[in-house]
């Protein structure tokens, strides 16, 4: 859903993509917080993927932040180690695919989190399209 207007994103907007070799560093990965809930054997990573300026320009986006909460049973991986592994798997999937779009990035995250140690993935995105 477009967070500015509240309108649903169309299939054409979600599948509109750019070849990966046309852009340098198209995605920024950030880890906001790592939570260790008390009395559990889980760790929660709050990961944000941002589209860089050239990718947003090519896809006619004003803002694109994809936020994920990854609930894992992995207690040994720190935030930076998990982020490096997560970034590698997402980029590997997109490199094999060759096209970056909103849906392809979500599919890449699904690929990266389809592991034994991942319990749940919660998504909360902030996407705004250009009107002009």
From Swiss-Prot:
Keyword flag Nucleotide-binding: no
UniProt GO BP: viral process
Alphabetized UniProt keyword annotations: Host-virus interaction
Function noted in UniProt: Increases viral DNA accumulation. Enhances infectivity and symptom expression.
Subunit structure: Homooligomer. Interacts with the replication-associated protein (REP). Interacts with host proliferating cell nuclear antigen (PCNA). Interacts with host retinoblastoma-related protein 1 (RBR1), and may thereby deregulate the host cell cycle. Oligomerization and interaction with PCNA are necessary for optimal replication enhancement.
Family: Belongs to the geminiviridae replication enhancer protein family.
Protein name as it appears in the record: Replication enhancer protein
């Amino acid at each position: 859903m477009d967070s500015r207007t509240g309108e649903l994103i169309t299939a054409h907007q979600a599948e509109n993509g750019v070849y990966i070799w046309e852009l340098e560093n198209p995605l920024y990965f950030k880890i906001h917080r790592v939570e260790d809930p008390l009395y559990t054997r889980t760790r929660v990573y709050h990961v944000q993927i941002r589209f860089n300026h050239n990718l947003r320009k090519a896809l006619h986006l004003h803002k694109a932040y994809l936020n994920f909460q990854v609930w894992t049973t992995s207690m040994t991986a720190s935030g930076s180690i998990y982020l490096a592994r997560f970034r590698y798997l997402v980029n590997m999937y997109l490199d094999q695919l060759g096209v970056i779009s909103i849906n392809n990035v979500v599919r890449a995250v699904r690929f990266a989190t389809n592991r034994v140690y991942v319990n749940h993935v919660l998504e909360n995105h902030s996407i705004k399209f250009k009107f002009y």
